[in-house]
Amino acid sequence: MVILLGSMGYVGQLFGQYFDRKGVAWTGISGRSFDLGAKDAILQTLKDSKATAVVNCAGYTGKPNVDACELDKGNCLDGNAVLPSAIREICGDLGIPWGHVSSGCIFALERPGGGGWREDDAPNFSFRHPPCSFYSGTKALGEEVLGYREVETSGADWPSWQHESEAEGYVWRLRIPFDQNDSPRNYLSKVQRYENLLQARNSLSQLEDFIAACWACFEKQVPFGIYNVTNPGSVTTSEVVDLIVKHGANNKDYKFFDNEEEFMAKAAKTPRSNCVLDTSKLEGVGINMRPVHEALDWSLQNWRPEA
């Protein structure tokens, strides 16, 4: 029996649908239903359900975007850092394997030395490396409470990110989720609805690919640890717009901010993460996702507008 925390959220609902298609027995629990101080109650829930695995999709992202986290810092911290810590402790006590949906939004800009940011790179868009959004700070802290630490390495371009002992579960980094279903949380929908766009290059995660890759970690019993679960490659905002227009999803006149300074002055309350992640670790354990342009093409070919 898989316990799915955050089963009513954007990503959690899709995990549940995936489990149904796969015939995986699961029980959903809302992350909000837990008093984060009542660890005994959480432990008893997992015991009573005879859980064989825990997937944590619960977290606090802010609606409509991360700016909202700046106004609700207590709940943001609880959902993104306190809850993962409780899950680690309880699952450790019960010997239950777990997976936690983290975020690639703990990095920004280009990686020193080139290439995409790797799992063993310390976050550079965090409370320890400001400025950052409060959301990103709490997501980086969420990895810290799961046992990861920044370590200075002689001769390295950037500090490393290492577990304090041995990794105990899966940490899956999601990055700018999208799929074929029009939704306020879908990146492709956001691009179509924003009045003005910021030009940036990013890694993205197609949600069906993301969920299948996460579950494959359990199925293949790959080593515990952090995995960047994004579609290989990267894409710019203008490339996404071109694909949206190409597939006829929305042919409006798209406008862009002149630069990030104008974006921050007119449309944002907190800095944004724009980055590219390296996916070679996931591929190295035999888990492959479609290239990002292919995944975007497919999602827009099968686009389902909101009713």
Summary of predicted features, one role per range:
Residues 20, 24-45, 59:
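Adenosine-cofactor binding site in Rossmann-like domains, unifying the SAM/SAH pocket
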Residues 71-78, 82, 105-172:
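Catalytic helix-loop patch of NAD(P)-dependent Rossmann-fold dehydrogenases
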Residues 213-269, 273, 298, 304-307:
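Mid/C-terminal beta-alpha module of Rossmann-like enzyme folds, strongest
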